[in-house]
From Swiss-Prot:
Pathway: Metabolic intermediate biosynthesis; chorismate biosynthesis; chorismate from D-erythrose 4-phosphate and phosphoenolpyruvate: step 3/7. Its EC number is 4.2.1.10. Belongs to the type-II 3-dehydroquinase family. It comes from Geotalea uraniireducens (strain Rf4). The record marks R17 as: Transition state stabilizer. This is 3-dehydroquinate dehydratase. The active site is at Y22, H99. InterPro entries: DHquinase_II (IPR001874), DHquinase_II_CS (IPR018509), DHquinase_II_sf (IPR036441). CDD domains: DHQase_II. Substrate binds at N73, H79, D86, L100, S101, R110. The keyword Heme does not apply. Disulfide bonds: none annotated. The keyword Amino-acid biosynthesis applies. Catalyzes a trans-dehydration via an enolate intermediate.
Amino acid sequence: MKILVLHGPNLNMLGTREPEVYGKMTLDDIDSTLKELACELGVELTIYQSNSEGALVDKIQSAVGSFDGILINPAAYTHTSVAIRDAIAATALPTVEVHLSNIHSREEFRTKSFVAPIALGQISGFGADSYLLGLRALFNHNKK
């Protein structure tokens, strides 16, 4: 099973950016924990981070025929990007949206997700564990 992991804008700043909101783990730390779990599950991961909406759309579109699912933290694009939402919908790949913080308990503008309605589900508020829970959800979904 192959899963594409996508990290959106500013996630490359984790560990130093608002640690009271996002925690002290770096993106490399999160990727390492994902790789450990993937190894246990027998899942192959491809991990990509970009601050560019177009680059993320390109990666999503290129996933068709190469991946069995997408694990995505769209970050700020969660609330603004119809392009990312449409790209995910067009792939028809099982997709889980994850967030480090609980987007529903934050500022009003952060509570709306363009991705959630077309995703298998959304996991938020569990810090780095949101990613691990999302990977397990995709794995279990694809095993059926």
